[in-house]
Swiss-Prot record:
Transmembrane segments: none annotated. Residues 623-633 have a biased composition (Basic and acidic residues). One of its GO terms (molecular function) is clathrin adaptor activity. InterPro entries: Adaptor_Complx_Large_Subunit, AP2_complex_asu, ARM-like, ARM-type_fold, Clathrin/coatomer_adapt-like_N, Clathrin_a-adaptin_app_sub_C, Clathrin_a/b/g-adaptin_app_Ig, Clathrin_app_Ig-like_sf. Adaptins are components of the adapter complexes which link clathrin to receptors in coated vesicles. Clathrin-associated protein complexes are believed to interact with the cytoplasmic tails of membrane proteins, leading to their selection and concentration. Alpha adaptin is a subunit of the plasma membrane adapter. It holds the Pfam family Alpha_adaptin_C. This is AP-2 complex subunit alpha.
Length: 939
């Protein structure tokens, strides 16, 4: 009788030992080749191998493959092991197949049939081996071959729990590679109800599967919310016994609790049912209460499990952002963790508070921990925690604490880790600009940034300070004085030289009256830095010098000497040679008037999104709050360093800078360039000038139509035979600025010209409009401008009117026009995906939160035209959100001084009836009516 062999496989152990004892690569290859020859002879021999021998040789082949050698035989023997009833042999067969067999193998059909046989087995061990093999391979072929069998195993009442668990995980693996394999219909409900299973392994695996399914198809699996809330409540609440015996260091089912909390975060709002919402809130409160209880164990495993559930609950509270009480409690709990001795807890607390700082309900609570966060930034040993503290200070900053936070960040920047300095510089620059009430403070901050961390100040930052100084007349003298003083330091960073050269070249004349900063002193100070700078900075300084010739003719000779030195072979850089040579000739040949025209002061830069903010969003896309995307729109002055140098010498532009009327205007940072007076007597010339401004061809037949300005900001607002009125406007959050351009089309002056704002005191409490006075005489063929600023305090229904009166040929003229200041001008577009949009849409289903109108199309249905109008209305037109491609949906936030009002809109065309249905939903009743009234009959 043959001896009974165990599973030790002594031959395999000896072979592995021989390989380990090899002294060289050649010896190892020789031993492997010898073994391969032996295995090949055994497989091809006349003697039939038993299961043990096949298993042993297949294991050797597998080991050789794992050493990095190709295996081109033994596959059939491994497949034969699948039909064995012995676990160890079947296990090795599946292991070999999972590792070595690819889906293009000739044996794949035979393998699939063997797997199907095991799936139908009554032995749960064999079924599990088959499921594990399917999951390990996880190919499209496997998904298609077993898309029917695995779901049946998962929901069948006869399937053992351990098999259900494996089936759920196997299905999850296949779903990730082939999302279309999961059957719908009645299967959906049966899969969801696995959340009620009493087996810990089954419900945990099922939760992972359902979480993946919900991310792909949230509407179909929305029924899981009620079950997840119910199960979570039973686990957390002590009065229930659900899974209370599955405790990990006194924490009931912590992994399942975390998975259920993450599952619920796929929906916003989590649920619309009041009862379910109340139960969820009660559960979250219970979790927060348990966090306050004394620990039941001193072991770290207890605190880790307890805190894992707590932090996931806080994430759900932040995700919902609808329960002020829970948000405040979560903030207070996180505040306690800021002083915890565990580094990971402090990091997680700071990270969660970054999200809480963006909520209107908890922002003020987060600010209460400002001092502790500042200490974390300065004192933490771990750089990642210090980095997170900086992120939190950035997130909690507002107009009330901006100066303090910016100063603390500047102080820390001197000793900060090199890895976080560049990002800190960007954040300080953004905060200083965003919350500047006095732009002299902003200039001080940026110059300090350059002084402290000049190497980390990117081009976008120093471009930015130049733009702001050029666009704001009231800060130009201070900037010139401050940068002049900064340049006197013995060691001066090159970025400081760039800023100083640019600003002194433009505004050095503003400080030239002081003998300490006389023209020659300015020139010598800048030129003392010249030889220490890169060619790019030297080129900028040469441009500054030619500007000095225009500003200070008395030092022309000194500057021309410098140009002569660098226009010959003494300068190795071709760009510097050419620039110096051209500037020298310009200073010699050009008359004073020509020189003044060519080298006149730079005009205001156009307004775009802040390039600094764009850089920060690229570096930290997840940590820049969405509401900052439109915060700072003063642009980088150029697209690159070269263009700064080129633009420093500027040919005369027909536009001049618009003077700011008040502090609000300054903060807006808008630069609407007015057209200069036109002295021509030709009507057509005047109209052409306006056409240049507005980018459109206007003519004398234009009619007054304020409704078209619902969808545009610039254009001709009014025109008759005497007067043409153009408008150019810009808006940011709840602030706006309009430039009105009055053009006299007649051959005689218009006297007693007087525009008067018609806007009641009651309406001013909702929309505050300030208007700058204009000259009383509008000369023939001339154009003047008038600046208006607007601040939206709360939503309003009407728009202000301006009454214009003047005398023409002795006859009094008077008429009124509506200003394009409807409430939609204060929209901020909001990006949403389909899930978020319809979740929010359903949440705003109350009678007072919606308004609807059905109206006949004013002209044959023009869907592209309707889309273009909506794109200009101020809201974000959301593509691929509505299931009906003809429907148009939009989202936006109306910014007022008192609050922000979220608004959703849906426009549904009916091509057959030539009609539209317009639905507007918002969190404020008056807004729904106002937006609906504005848009009705516009299509």
């Amino acid at each position: 009788m043959a001896p009974v062999r165990g599973d030790g496989m002594r031959g395999l152990a000896v072979f592995i030992s021989d390989i380990r004892n090899c002294k060289s690569k050649e010896a190892e290859v020789k031993r492997i080749n010898k073994e391969l020859a032996n295995i090949r002879s055994k497989f091809k021999g006349d003697k039939t191998l038993d299961g043990y021998q096949k298993k042993k040789y297949v294991c050797k082949l597998l080991f050789i493959f794992l050493l990095g050698h190709d295996i081109d035989f033994g596959h059939m023997e491994a497949v034969n092991l699948l039909s064995s009833n012995k676990y160890s042999e079947k296990q090795i067969g599946y292991l070999f197949i999972s590792v070595l067999v690819n889906t293009n193998s000739d044996l794949i059909r035979l393998i699939i049939q063997s797997i199907k046989n095991d799936l139908q087995s009554r032995n749960p061990v064999h079924v599990n081996l088959a499921l594990q093999c399917i999951a390990n391979i996880g190919s499209r072929d496997m998904a298609e071959s077993f898309s029917n069998e695995i779901p049946k195993l998962l929901v069948s009442g006869d399937t053992m729990d351990v098999v259900k668990q494996s089936a759920a995980l196997c299905l999850l693996r296949l779903f990730r590679s082939s999302p279309d394999i999961i059957p719908g219909g009645e299967w959906t409900s049966r899969i969801i109800h696995l959340l009620n299973d009493q087996h810990m392994g089954v419900v945990t695996a099922a939760t992972s599967l359902i979480d993946a399914l919900v991310k792909c198809n949230p509407d179909e699996y929305k029924g899981c919310v009620n079950l997840a809330v119910s199960r979570l409540s039973r686990i957390v609440t002590a009065s229930y016994t659900d899974l209370q015996d599955y405790t990990y260091y006194f924490v009931p089912a912590p992994w399942l609790s975390v998975k259920l909390l993450r599952l619920l975060q796929n929906y916003n709002p989590v649920t619309e049912e009041a009862g379910v919402r109340a139960r969820l809130n009660e559960t979250l409160e219970t979790i927060l209460n348990k966090a306050q209880e004394p620990p039941k164990s001193k072991k770290v495993q207890h605190s880790n499990a307890k805190n894992a559930v707590l932090f996931e609950a806080i994430n759900l509270i932040i995700h919902s952002d609808s329960e002020p009480n829970l948000l405040v409690r979560a903030c207070n709990q996180l505040g306690q963790f800021l002083s915890n001795r565990e580094t990971n807890l402090r990091y997680l607390a700071l990270e969660s508070m970054c999200h809480l700082a963006t909520s209107e309900f908890s922002h003020e609570e987060v600010k209460k921990h400002q001092e502790v966060v500042i200490l974390s930034m300065k004192m933490e040993k771990d750089v990642s925690v210090r980095q997170m503290a900086v992120d939190l200070l950035y997130a909690m900053c507002d107009r009330g604490n901006a100066e303090e936070i910016v100063q603390e960040m500047l102080n820390y920047l001197e000793t900060a880790d090199y890895s976080i300095r560049e990002e800190m510089v960007l954040k300080v620059a953004i905060l200083a600009e965003k919350y500047a009430t006095d732009y002299t403070w902003y200039v001080d901050v940026i110059l300090n940034l350059i002084r402290i961390a000049g190497d980390y100040v990117s081009e976008e930052v120093w471009y930015r300070v130049i733009q702001i100084v050029i666009n704001r007349e009231e800060v130009q003298g201070y900037a010139a004085k401050t940068v002049f003083e900064a340049l006197q330091a013995p060691a001066c960073h090159e970025n400081m030289v760039k800023v100083g050269g640019y600003i002194l070249g433009e505004f050095g004349n503003l400080i030239a009256g002081d003998s300490r900063s006389a023209p020659l002193v300015q020139f010598k100070l800048l030129h003392s830095k010249y030889h220490l700078c890169s060619p790019m900075t030297r080129a900028l300084l040469l441009s500054t010098y030619i500007k000095f010739i225009n500003l200070f003719p008395e030092i022309r000779t000194n500057i021309q000497d410098v140009f002569r030195q660098h226009s010959n072979l003494r300068s190795a850089d071709a760009e510097l040679q050419q620039r110096a040579s051209e500037y020298l000739q310009l200073s010699i040949v050009a008359s004073t008037d020509v020189l003044a025209t060519v080298l006149e002061e730079m005009p205001s830069f156009p307004e775009r999104e802040s390039s600094i903010l764009a850089v920060l969003k690229k570096k930290k896309p997840g940590r820049v709050p969405e509401n900052e995307i439109r915060e700072s729109k003063s642009p980088a002055p150029t697209s690159g360093p070269g263009s700064v140098l080129q633009n420093n010498v500027h040919v005369n532009n027909s536009h001049s800078k618009l003077n700011n009327s008040n502090a609000n205007t300054d903060l807006l940072g808008l630069s609407t360039p007015p057209a200069n007076n036109v002295g021509s007597n030709s009507n057509s010339t005047l109209i052409d000038v306006l056409g240049d401004i507005y980018g459109s061809n206007n003519n004398s037949s234009a009619v007054y139509n304020t409704k078209k300005f619902l969808f545009k900001n610039n254009g001709v607002l009014f025109e008759n035979e005497m007067l043409q009125i153009g408008v150019k406007s810009e808006f940011r959050q709840n602030l706006g600025r309009l430039g009105l351009f009055y053009g006299n089309k007649t051959q005689v002056p218009l006297s007693n010209f007087n525009p008067v704002l018609q806007w009641s005191a009651e309406e001013t409490l909702k929309l505050n409009v300030q208007m700058k006075a204009v000259e009383p005489t509008l000369e023939a063929g001339a154009q003047i401008q008038q600046l208006l600023t607007a601040e939206c305090i709360e939503d309003y229904a009407d728009a202000p009117t301006i009454e214009i009166s003047f005398r023409y040929n002795g006859t009094q003229q008077k008429f009124s026009i509506k200003l394009p200041l409807s409430v939609n001008k204060f929209f901020e577009p909001t990006e949403m995906n389909a899930e978020s949009f319809f979740a929010r849409w359903k949440n705003l289903s109350g009678e007072q939160q919606r308004s609807q109108k059905v109206f006949k199309a004013a002209q044959p249905l023009d869907l592209p035209g309707a889309r273009n109008k909506l794109m200009g209305f101020g809201m974000q037109l959301l593509d691929s959100v509505d299931p009906n491609p003809d429907n148009m949906v939009c989202a936006g936030i109306i910014h007022t001084q008192s609050q922000q009002v979220g608004c959703l809109m849906r426009l549904e065309p009916n091509k057959q009836a030539q009609m539209f249905r317009l639905t507007v939903r918002a969190s404020k009743e008056t807004v729904t009516r106002e937006i609906c009234d504005l848009l009705a009959d516009q299509f």
